[in-house]
């Protein structure tokens, strides 16, 4: 179960990526969940990731999604 701070961070990431990718939050969630990025990277690495800036996070996760073969 996620703690409130982790859940807040995930929501922040979903919205930031949605704005950058011109997608809805549910569409972004589906991509991150289906690729394992949500659980295996964003949530697992919360302690480090939450200290980074929005622009860096968006670029980093966008690149990671593309490495998984999904165009965003």
Where would I find each of the regions flagged by the language model?
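Short amphipathic alpha-helical segments, especially helix-boundary/capping motifs
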Residues: 1-6, 35-39
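N-terminal acidic leader/helix
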Residues: 2-27
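Amphipathic, hydrophobic secondary-structure cores in small proteins
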Residues: 18, 24-49
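Long, compositionally biased
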Residues: 46-72
